[in-house]
Amino acid sequence: MIASLLPAEDSMTASPLRFILKTFALALLLSAGVAHADKYVLISHAPDSDAWWNTIKNAIKQAGEDYGVQVDYRNPPSGDLADMARLIEQASAAGYDGVIVTIADYNVLQGAIGKVTAKKIPLITINSGTVEQSEKLGAIMHVGQPEHAAGKGAGERAKAAGVKSFLCVNHYATNPASFERCRGFAEVIGVDYKKSTLDSGDDPTTIESKVAAYLRQNPNTNGVLTLGPTSASPTIKALEKSGQAGKLWMATFDLSDDISKGIKSGTVQFAIDQQPYLQGYIPVAVLATMKQMKTTDLKKVMEAVKANPKTQKRFAEYGLTPVYGDRHISSGPGFVTKENISKVEKYAGQYR
């Protein structure tokens, strides 16, 4: 019977993935007769102060409603990765039907994540980390934006605009994956990303002060890249106070009300949109569908998710376009500019 739940050899020949799915198939069978509401958890690396994650919280809530499951959200209040590892370990012992995690730091988290897969709990990784790391951890799939590629995409636009030196404002330097954004950008314009990156911390007043000081001390800087709303809003304030808003080239990752206003005013050239809603919604949809269909055939599961009327309605309403691969799903990058901001600002910070 377990064999009937597995994809045919010719449709999925990668033995590591087949082993993962065989393990989860057994777990599905063992739990098939248990009468309880399916329950999942998403554990992120984000501190409580990072409002960007509200979109993902909204996504898992709506996915739970659409698929009739319960989804919890857990995070380390201060963003401490040791705390995150403990949350993952706790989740492995809490009886969840599936676990969703960010790979904020592979080396720090691999032990804790290993406890999840050791108990044959289905795992999906999102947001931070690479597909290679996701596969090494035994995850079913990764849903996220290739960070280095996104940085390069931003760098190409900056280079075309004449940017030759830049400041990368990193408000979450505790996450090694964050530097991939800066590195990709720097490679395109031909500078050292380490010399161009500012560990700003996440306090708005401190970020504004540090950015202003850097630009005073490095007057030849002709571009600024911020890594999200937490660093973008204070940077916009710093540029406005120094009279450089709209004069010094600026771009950012992600969306918020302040960023939308900045794009419309010309202060921000574009926002790199990783469609975070997808990172929350799709993993819940996939895990719930696997459980409900009692199958680990990813092709069938993804087709079912794509065909789900409630899912289709959500994505159409919010203007979201995931890119489905054979195993992994890319949520971005997309670029929000003055030309298309009106299409997305209605839901910025909520569902975009």
Report each predicted region and the residues it spans.
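Hydrophobic alpha-helical
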Residues: V101-A118, F185, S200-G262
